[in-house]
């Protein structure tokens, strides 16, 4: 059974994620701030952190960067991190933070479950909805 730590200061978002992911193969835990995420990961046994980009004083980017730093000198076991992005422009932040994956809000249950499964298999996951779409207008294409 894999342990997934949901990190958000919004109870509604944590409940929404729990409803999407809860099942017999996942143990779901919750944290309301970045410090609690770091503390729980240091204790060990967390396979995936799903973190909201905007969490009080320590959001997903800071959490991810700190975890990568601590992993580098053995303070915690390596853990996959999935960021929940507020808008398409946040993809740059997700990539800079070395997150293993990201999903852009609004959250779609199927997409979130696919991302979590991929990350738990050791793969990366990028939500494709951030990419610009090409729209055909008459005889020309517009982006």
Question: What annotation goes with each model-predicted range?
Answer:
Residues 47, 72-80:
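His-Asp phosphorelay/catalytic-motif detector in bacterial-type signaling
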Residues 62, 83-101:
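Alpha4 helix (beta4-alpha4-beta5 surface) of REC/receiver domains from two-component response regulators
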Residues 123-143:
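CheY-like receiver
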Residues 32-48, 52:
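Acidic, metal-coordinating helix/loop segments flanking the phosphotransfer/catalytic sites
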Residues 47-70:
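Conserved phosphotransfer microenvironments
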Residues 49, 102-103:
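Two-component signal transduction core modules
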Residues 8-32, 36:
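Two-component/phosphorelay signaling modules centered on CheY-like receiver
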Residues 107-117:
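C-terminal output helix
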């Amino acid at each position: 059974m894999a342990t997934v730590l949901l990190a958000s200061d919004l109870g509604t978002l944590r409940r929404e994620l729990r409803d999407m992911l809860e099942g017999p193969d996942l143990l779901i835990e919750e944290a309301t701030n970045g410090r609690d995420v770091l503390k729980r990961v240091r204790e060990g046994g967390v396979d995936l952190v799903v973190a909201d980009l905007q969490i009080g004083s320590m959001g997903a980017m800071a959490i991810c960067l700190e975890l990568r730093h601590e992993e580098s000198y053995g303070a915690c076991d390596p853990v996959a991190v999935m960021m929940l992005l507020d808008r398409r422009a946040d993809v740059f932040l997700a990539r800079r933070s070395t997150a293993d994956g990201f999903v852009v809000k609004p959250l779609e249950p199927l997409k979130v479950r696919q991302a979590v499964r991929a990350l738990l298999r050791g793969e990366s996951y990028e939500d494709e909805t951030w990419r610009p779409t090409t729209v055909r207008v008459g005889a020309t294409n517009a982006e």
